[in-house]
Amino acid sequence: MTTDPANRSQPGATAPLSDLHEQDARTGGADAAPAPTTSPVSTGPPERPPVYPQHPSSGTWHPVSTAGAPLSVRDVDAAASTAPSAHTSAQATARSSVRSPSETAAAGVVLRDLADEYAMLLCAHDPEAAARTGLPGGAILPDYSPAGLAERLSAERSLRHRVAAVDRSTGSDELLRRHLLERLETSIQFISAGEEGGNLGFLSSPFQQIARQLHRPPETPDRAGSEEADLAEAEAKWEDAWNLHRTRLEALPAALEGLAASLATSAEAGAIAPLSQVDVVAGQARDLASRRTRGLPEDLPATLHVQLQEADISARRAALDFASHLRTTLSPRAPQAEGVGRRRHALWMRRVLGTRVDPEETYAWATEELARVIAEQDAIAVDILGPGANAHSLNRHLRADPTQALRPQDYTIWAQEVADEAWDVVVGRVLDPPDGLGRPRVRLGESGAGVVRYEEPRGTGGERRPGVVLRSLADGERLVWPWMERTTVLHESVPGHHVHVGAHATSTRLTAWQRYLGSVAGCDEGWGLYAESLADELGLMPTPEDRFGRLAARRWRLARVLVDLGVHSRLPVPDDVAALPGASREWNRATVTAVLRHHTVISEGRLRFE
C-alpha cells in the first residue's frame, strides 16, 4: 500500500474514501502503470506540513526560468514517437541524473505548455471546466457520447506520451510531470474500462453534470443601477443569459442520446451500475422533465419566447425518453446487488485517491480508528455528564435544549464569524496564502441535500468571485447545532479548503490545469481533515462540545469508509456491525442504514440523502 492509512489525517495524506466532497476527482490493460511509492518531502519552510509528491498540487510552485533554448512541443512530439506506452518507476530511475540549467528550464516550459493543452482539452468537452478556468470552451453541454469519449481518450494518450518524453525536469516541474502522468493514466484507464461512459450515480455522474448546466437564468434583469446605460446593459446581459439557456435546452436531446449510447456500450463491456443507481437516475431524469414546466418571463423578446417554449418542450421529451431508456433497456441488465466489485472498485479508488490502496488493510485500519474515536467521544461525555455517560447520551443531552441551536436565518452570520476568526488566527501566522485569496464568504444555498461544499474563487486572483462556503439544509432541518457545525465550517474555510483549494485557484505560479482541473479529491480532503486537527491545536474549538463535534464528524466519515469498502469491495461484515439493529451478514441497504444511523449525529433527512 502506497500510503499508510494511519497517516491519512496528516497534511497531504490521502483521505479516506468517505471524505470526498465531490465523487468526481480522476485496472487493468496496457494502459496500467504503477503509482509512485515515495516518502513525503517538503517544498516549503520546515514548519510547514510536508507535501506528498504523488499529489503535487499540494506543493509550492515557483516560476520557471526560460534561460537557454527551450524545447518546443513539436520536439517533444517527435521524441514521443519512440516513447513507451506508459511511464514506470524503472524508466524514471533510468533517466540521466546530469541536467544542465537550460535543459531543466526548457523541460519546465514544455510541461507547462502540455498542462495548458490538457486544460484546453477538458474545456473543449465540458462547459463547467471552461467556466471554472475562464478558458474558451467548445461544448454547449458535457459530451459523454462514444465519439466524444473516444476523441478525449485519443488526445489523452497523445498527451501522456509527450509528458513521459520530457525527462529533464527537476523539483516542482518533476512534480508537475508526475502529476500529469498519474491523472492522465488514471483517466485513460477509466475511459478504456468503460467506467466513464457507464457512470450512473446519485450526485456527480455524467447525467448530473449535464443537468446542472440547465439552471434557469434570473426571472428579471438586475435593475439595481440607476443610470439608463446601466439598465440597458443589465437587460442585454439578461437576454444573453436566456439565449444561452435556449441553446442548452436545444442541445439536451443530443447530449442525452450520446450518454445513452455510451451507457449501452459500457454495459456490453461489463461496466454497468447497480439497479438501485439506475433507478435513482431515472427518477432524476423524470424530475428534470417536471421542473421544465414553469412559465417563462413575460418581458422576454417575442421571438426568443417562442424559441424557448419549443426548446423547453424538446428538452422535457428528451429527459423523459432518457428515463424510459434507463427503465426499459438498462434496468433489466443491471445487477441487483449493491456495489461494483473489487476489480472495478480498485479503479474508482485510484481515480479518487490518486494512488492504490489495499482494501483489507484500509478496512482494518478504519475499524480500529473508529473504535478509538468512539472511546474519545465517550471520555468527553464522562467529563461533561459524569460516570456512566457515553457518546449517545451526550448527543441527546446537547440536542435537548433548542435554545442552544441556530435558526437557519442565523446560520450565515454565526458561520461567517467562525471563518473570520479563523482567518485572523491562521493567515500570516501559520499559513501564507496568495495575496489575491481574500477571506471566504459563507452562504446558505437551497434546501434539500443537507450538505456543505466549498467553491473556489473564479478568475486569476479571485477578482470575479471570492471563495464561498455553501451550506444546504436537509429537507425538514430547522435547527443547526453550533457544536456540530464548527468543525465543518473550519474544514471548508480556514484553515481548510479555502487556504488549500482556494490558494491553488488564485496562485499565479500554477497553470490553469493545476489551479482548477488537476486536483485529487483524496488529497483535498486529506488537507481538510488535517485542518480540523490544526484548528483544534490553534484554539479554534474552545469547548469540549466543539471537540466532541469534531470527533462526531470523524466517526461519521470512518463509518462511511467501512460502508464504501464493504459494499464495493465486498468485504465481510464485521461482527459488531452485524449485531446492530436491522443489520445482517450482508452489505445491503438495511445494513448500511444501520451503520450510518448508529454512528451519525446528523438529521434523518441527511441520512436518507447519504
Provide a role label for each language-model segment.
Residues 1-24, 64, 71-73:
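N-terminal acidic, proline/glycine-rich, low-complexity intrinsically disordered segments
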Residues 2-5, 80-83, 87-89, 93-610:
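N-terminal maturation segment of proteins
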Residues 26-36, 83-84:
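Compositionally biased, low-complexity flexible segments
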Residues 22-25, 78, 88:
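Short hydrophobic alpha-helical segments enriched in small aliphatic residues
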Residues 13, 40, 48, 58, ...:
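Short linear/disordered segments characteristic of secreted peptide precursors
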